[in-house]
Each structure stands twice: as structure tokens, then as C-alpha cells.
Amino acid sequence: RRPWHRRPMAAASPSTSDAAERLARLVQRLRRLVRGELILAGGHARLQPQDETDVATALELARELAVPVRFGGVTGDLPAVLAGHADSSRGGLPGLQIDASSHLTRAARFDGARGMIEVQPGVRLADLNRLLQPHGWWLPIETHPESGATLGGLVGLDAAAAALAWGTLADRLLGMDAILDDGTRQLFGPFGARSSVSLNSGRAGQLVSSLFGIAAGVQADMARHWPPGQRVPDGYLLDVFHPRPQRPYTPDGSVNLAHLLAGSAGTLAWSARLHLRLLRRPAVSRWALFLQPSAAAALTHAPAVLALQPSAALLLDAADLRRLAGSHHPDDQALCRLAGIGPGMSGCLDGAQPGKAGLAAWLVRFSGEADADVQAAHRRLTALLDPRRQEGAAGLSLQAGGGLQSHGRAAAGDVQPVWQALLGERVSPTIPPSACIIPLPPQDPATLAGLVAALDERLVSQGVQPSWRGQVAAGELQLVVPEGAGPMARQTLAGTLPPRWTPALRQAFADVRRQFDPTGILLGGR
């Protein structure tokens, strides 16, 4: 099931023939009113808008005609398993998809002194970081090299950086020019007496007033139950109205309404322009790989590993290790040699024995301006995870924009390193054949070892062999089970994990959705 707040408002489901008729009327009117290209396929319509006016017109007419709308093309190849895309009784009805990736791809107003930029939602993350690299800046989100992820989609996910200190895209969002479901345009940004953002319509004024009221009504629940300092992929970021030290969002603790739209997966509004705060690209990075007997054993070290402030701390499973061991890229081969993975270990990586946990590993990166400091951090990590290791105790060097350098070998131009794919798959996972990946809601990293051990015991007792992978700094793990075991694993998770939200918070999420999209036409991403 999709997160409940991603679903449209409850309404009588129209028949397919009625929906098709309304879509035909919408397309007929749009052909006269928009400059973008309209494509009809499979009973649906796809609009590639030339500009923001096309989007505003399309949304206004779609609301009038009750045609469901999806925002496509903004998430690249990010799969629905993480994207939280809406799915409902309306999901199969004829609808309109608005795709930003063809024409809304401009970046503007780059401030190289302060590290700020304005972009349209169809700009691809890889293109932006390529543009910024000569200036020493980057947007610190790392996706799969071939994902084609765009900024509109990543903001919709509130994608997390690999380093806890680098935050999520909500933390990088200074403002958002949004288009609401009725075509109203509004800049969402800092709110308060010192803000220069004005509410330019009665709809916007009423909306903002209602949002503050909703947040005030659940302040007590948030103080007791809101997850501290974590991404919220299954709710809206109501904590922007009650900032806390664990995640202040803004330097002075003020309210920035753009942050509420981060992570909403296109269910609240269209992001027309994003105003982003960039990060200085670190001068040097070093990596290391450490084998562990099991995921639960690896995660017992999580608090100590994270206390060293790595710029990436990934938990790998046996399938990930097999990919590294089978790679022809010298980066991956060097990492495997460092961890003692050789040809003789192939049997250990083939999978766990029945009733036993599978092999796991830490893949850890430290980054900084001074290589001596980065090497020192790796030595402390090596002393923690593998005190007997001598060679490579200072990690393998990764230069900005280059590959691992310490082994002195070049890779063929068409061979991509597996470690880079593994890093990006924390945002956009590759699902192995005959496997099911179930993302867990973000957890406190200090509790992960006990949680994984308990779930391993329950799943193994039911004949399911689990493995675990994920981004430990963000407390986000992915449970991997055989494809047919997915329903049983989900049931076990539901019986083990405590409820995420109180009834009052669930109602608040629904109220936020209703304020933005009262007719329920916005179905989110593709």
C-alpha cells in the first residue's frame, strides 16, 4: 500500500468512459491554449510544457474538468518503491501527465560567492553538478549515475545526502515558486515580519493561515512523537512550523513554507522554480570497506561509526558484495583487496546458509579539506572495525570528479564503478531479479541493531532469509527478501515496528492535503 497521505481525497470514482470523455475535452481545450506538445498514448495524455504558463493553464482546466494529474519526467528512473507515488482508485483512469524534463531545464541566477542558484524542475542533478564543479560547489545528493534524476523529482522525495551533516533537499531549499491545483502561482519561502515574500492572492492567504492552524493543533503530538532529525517519506514536514535543534531547517529557526512542499511527491503543488543553497565540494575523500559477519553485527557499531562523522556510511548485503567482487573496475577491485575479498571468498558471498544471517559490510567515506584529517578519521574507523588491518588503514583516496587513485590503475572508459552505483542506489535502488526491496521508515541509528536482530529472528523462523542494505547515517534501511516473501515480510514489519503517527498527526496530514488539493486531482509523481 502507498502511504495513505499520497492518495487523493475520497470521492465517488467516475467511470472510465466518463473520465475518458473529460480527458478528451481537456485535450481539446489545451491544444488551443498551450504552446507545449500534447501526446496521446494508452488512454492518457502527456503534456510537455514550454513554460510555466502552460502548467498553470493545464492545472486550472484539469481541476475544472476533474481530470487526475500526475507529474512525470521529474524523477528520472527513480522507482515507485521509494518515490511514494500516489496510487488509488483513480490511478487507472484516463488522466494528464505533465512532464518537465523536455523543456523546463534552465538554471539561472547562480551566485558563486554565496553558493545559491535558481533552477527549473526538469534540470537533471548530474547536469547541475557538472555545471557547478568548476566553481567548487555542488548539490550533495548522489544518485545512481544512470538514473537521470531531476531536481523537481528529488525535491519531491526530499532526497537525503549520504552525510547526516549535509541534510536533505529540504535543508537546501531556500524557496519554491509553486503552481497550485487551480493555477494560482505563489512563492513559498521565509515567512514572518522580516520576510520579503508576499502572499499574492486570496487563495494563498487562506491556505497559509489554514496551514499554521493545522500545525498549531498538533504541536503537542509533534513534541512527543515526531521523529527527531530524520527524513519523513510517509508524511508532510509539519515540523517546519515547530523547528527543533535536531533539524532547524533555517539558521535562525524561522518558518520557511517551501520546506513543507519538500517530500510531498507532487501531491500538493507543482514546483515551477527551485531556489537552492549549495554546498562547497570537499577537496578530498577516502573510502574503505569492512566485512562484517551479519547486518545486526555491523549495526552494533553504528553509533560509534557515526560519531566519527563520515560523509557516507552504507550497509551492504551479500548481493552488493558479489557485485563489487565481480567488477572489472579497478576502484572496486582495490576496495575488495582492502577488505580481504579475493577469489577464494566467492563461496562466502553466495548467500547465507538456512537459519543463519548473511554476510554484510560497511562502505564508509570521509571527506574534508585536508587529506591528513581524512586519513586520521579512517585510522580511527579502522581501529574500531578491523584493528588488525595495516595496509590501507588510511582509506583509498577519491579526488573530486575522479576515481580511486591509490591503486594507480585506470579503468576502461565504459566501465562504471560499482561503489558509485551502490552509493546512488540509496536513493534509487536496483531491485535484484526475484527479489523484493522493502524500505523501512527512517529509524534512530542507535536502535537499528536491535531492530534488525529481532526482525531477522522472526523472518528466519518463518522460512524467509532476509538481507539488509541502506544509508545508516539517515537511519534508512532496505529489507531484501525473495520476491514471493514480500507480503509475509511486510506483515512481520507491521507487527514489529511501532505506529509512526498518532491519529491526530494522520488527520493533520490529510488536512494539509485537502487544503492544497480539495478536489483530489493531484496524484503525485508518475
Q: Where do the language-model regions lie?
A:
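N-terminal basic/disordered segments at the start of proteins
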Residues: T16-E37
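Intrinsic disorder at enzyme termini
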Residues: A10-A12, T16-A19, L23, L497, ...
